[in-house]
Regions:
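Terminal, regulation- and interaction-focused segments at domain boundaries
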Residues: 1-33
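Short beta-strand element of the conserved SAM-dependent methyltransferase core
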Residues: 11-12, 59-62, 87
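Amphipathic alpha-helical interface surfaces
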Residues: 21, 25, 42, 66-67, ...
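Compact, glycine-rich, soluble single-domain proteins
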Residues: 37-83
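Beta-strand/loop substructures that line and gate deep hydrophobic ligand-binding cavities in soluble
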Residues: 85-112
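Well-ordered alpha/beta subsegment
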Residues: 107-131
């Protein structure tokens, strides 16, 4: 079993900086009519507290039209929705796009097969932003 399969996180390398990757993601979400609920700048908040960390930003996004049927069928998934994508820079300067694996969420919350498509687009979003 791969590390990704064990922890449910998919990591995709980005060809861009954290800020450029975040901007690409915001543009993709906007073009698809997906709502960006919040953008958390972890590294910016760390700096305000006098601490240093590599650039790290979390996008929280979703579509009530897509997510609500999933939550009705599997209420515990509400702890993992809205969907999240983490864009972060590792100690070597490489930028990554990380998200929960839809398959992991399916298994974790027993999401019916016919509804997993409602949240599976997260991987395509991350892949599009990485290139």
């Amino acid at each position: 079993m791969s590390d990704q399969a064990k922890n449910g996180i998919v990591d995709i390398p980005s060809n861009h900086s954290v800020d450029a990757t975040v901007e690409k993601l915001k543009g993709i979400l906007n073009s698809k009519g997906v709502m960006l609920f919040a953008l958390v700048d972890h590294s910016g908040e760390a700096a305000k507290a006098g601490l240093k960390m590599p650039p790290t930003k979390l996008l929280i996004f979703g579509s009530p039209k897509a997510g609500t049927p999933v939550m009705l069928a599997a209420p515990s998934i509400a702890i993992d929705l809205p969907l999240k994508i983490l864009v972060w820079q590792d100690a070597n300067g490489k930028v990554w796009i990380s998200s929960n694996s839809p398959q992991y969420l399916k298994e974790r919350h027993n999401v019916p097969d016919d509804l997993i498509k409602n949240i599976a687009a997260v991987e395509a979003l991350a892949t599009a932003a990485a290139s």
